[in-house]
Amino acid sequence: MLQPPDEHAHADVAVEAWWWWAASADGSQGAFVGFELRGRRFDYWAGFVRAGEPYLYIEELDGTGLRDGLEIKPPEMWADHVCDVAFQQWSLGNEAHGVLLDDPEEAWRRAHGTVVPVTFDIEWYASGEPTEIAHGYEQRGEVDAQIELTEGIVAFTGPASRVHVWGVPFMPSSFAMPVATTGLRAPYRRNDGTRIDQVLTDRWWANVIGPAVS
């Protein structure tokens, strides 16, 4: 049975991962945040997609600068992930420089794009009880999100989901590339070069594993 301490880091595991996904009510924009902890080192990803706009991508792989809880302060950025009420509410934030990618697949390579300052301020609220999965749990919710860009603040509310696993990294279950030809793409790369493709479709976020970057 899940207990409130399960929301936080487990000291006896080699790896632990927290992931959140969100979309606006009309599906025209969405965001994600991923955080994977390995001892005192970590990987961090965040992204924001909008119809007709470049993909905004943030990554910090094999980072250092872990503070108390799930707060991180590597060079040139800050992020925090705060459990306000166990299984009910999380607060996610960052202050970083992201890259705007006209070609989302550039995130699989060197992520060359236009560098821009960005701030995420996301409140995640549960809309149901967590469901146990292998090595952790998943949960549905909703968000109140504000993404601050150079042109101003983009705000949206809408459905959300999250996953928390420990003892293993979070990896999508499929090894086939997405068949969706429409949607907002938000791919990312893991620190071992594995490509993960994510697409915000009219049904929800889909994410699958692709081949490692050569």
Give the role of each language-model region:
Residues 1-214:
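Targeting-peptide/extracellular-domain and disordered-appendage signature
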